[in-house]
Structure formats: structure tokens, C-alpha cells
Amino acid sequence: MLYYMSNFTLSDSFLLKIFSNKNSRLFEEAGNHVLKENSGSKDQVGIIYNDYNADPKMVDAWQKETKGMSVYYVAPRSKTLRMDAKVLFAKKMKESQYVPKTYFGYDEIPTDTPDNALFFVKKNGSTGSRGVDIHAYSAMKDLDYTERVVQQNMNVPDLYDDKRYKIRAYVVLHDKNVFLFNKSFATVASEDYKEAVGDMDQEALRKMHVIFQTSGTKFILSEELDKFELVQQNMLVACKDFKNVYRDEIKRIEANEYAILGFDFVVDSEGGVQIIEINHRSNYAHPKVMENKVDVPLLK
């Protein structure tokens, strides 16, 4: 879906200037909310969200155009690449208890692993479900592991309406700090969950376990989950662990920079969580309810 870049100014004594080249409609909607809430303020603020890196010439031009304007812009991709890239993320977080058991080749997997144990094999650089396969251990010996990450499937996942789900939570990095946004949503698998017994073909496994966005994907607000309060607490703890592991990278996020990270969590039957991947340039194309309840409040 194509979104045209937009550059617009909102003012009611409080001055807010916004540039976005990704779903600018949501940024404008969030900006109007901010404008109403800060009516009468004399602050002058600029926000730049670029899917690549902010143009320093734009920052300079805004500050020259409006003396005293505070301009905040998305952190350069180089500062968050080790969070976003699948192989780099896996290597960095491998020892954390808040990610799946992680391997980079068949020979690393313990030999006493049950034949029907499932593993996700993810190709570096893939987006969404593209480049993600799921295999039983018995079928993995001859796979290609070049530039791939192997994550072991959790044994007993939590279910929604008898199906697996994946939570998308937003984490904001700003001025060396980490913030977990308190609203999130989940996407639900297309097929009911069944334990892997005997041979199951790749397509059947994908429909149960590889959860991705299509025109027919079911979205729910995370607060609809039975264990939501516990899951929310555990996501916060996982984010604290992330902050510790990535402390050097987070220290590089300056006072005038921010990053909005999309954390994908899976949840077990006890409400425990695992971060399966992080996206440092999220896609905000979601159903209207998710936009109104999660995306716009986040951007605001």
C-alpha cells in the first residue's frame, strides 16, 4: 500500500510541524489530538518520521524558519539495525530467557530433541511471513541455514478462540530511555491449534503457527485476552531485559532522537512471553479499530 509523504503545520498558539513519509494520515490525526490537548501553549515542536533517515537539511531549515523550535526525528537506522535484523537480534538476545531457544544450524540443536519438536526457520532480511518456515526436527537435517535463524517453538502456547496469536507491542526509545506503550493488539492464526503428532505438511503447520497479516487476518485488542494483565506485566519485564542487553545501543539514542520499535511477542499457557522479533520501521496499516485504539494514541 502506497502512502504519500506529507509535510504539514498545525497551529493554535502551540505550533506543531510534522513530516512523515509513512501513513501520514495517522500522523496528522495524532497531531490534531496533540494540538487540541496543548491549545494555548507557546511551545514550538517539529516531528520528523522518515522510513529511512531524517534529512539534516530539513531539521536545519525548520529551526531557521521557526526560531526556538524543538525538532525530534527518528533515530538513524544504523542505531537500531542490531535490533531489527533477524540474525543480529538473535545473536544479541540468544542468552535471554525472553526469546525462544535460538540456533544457527542443525548441528547446534541438541541430539535428544524429540522428532516432532517444531522449529521456525527465518531468513535474514525477510519481512512479515515471507522467508519464515516451520519444520519438525526430524525434517531439518538437510535444510539451508545460510543467513537464517532457528527458533524453537514453545511447547504449550496460550490460545484465543482455540488459535495461536501474536502480540504487536510498541516500544519507544528516546533520550537513552525505553518505554513500553500500554496499548497493543494481537493477530490470530487462521487455523485451530493442534499438537504436532506424526507428519504434518508445511502448509498445515504454517496456518497454525506462522501468524501474518492478510486481508482476512483477525485482529484483537490485547486487552481482550484472558491473561492480559499478567501478559502486560511480563512484556514489561521482557523490555527491561531488552534494555539491559542493548544498553550500549540505547545510550546512543540522543535527546532529539526517538525510535518506535514493533515488538512481536508470543505467549505461553502460563502467560509467559517471548520476543520473537523486533521491527524498527513498523507498518501502521491496520484495521480502523487498531488505528484508533493503538496506532494513533501511540503516535500522539
Describe every region a protein language model picked out.
Residues 263-265:
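Hydrophobic residue at the +6 position relative to the catalytic HRD Asp in the kinase catalytic loop
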Residues 89, 93, 169, 278:
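A residue-level signal for conserved active-site and pocket-lining positions in enzyme catalytic cores
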Residues 116, 124-259, 268-273, 279, ...:
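Catalytic core of tubulin tyrosine ligase-like
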Residues 3-118, 125-127:
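Conserved N-proximal alpha/beta basic substrate-recognition cap immediately N-terminal to
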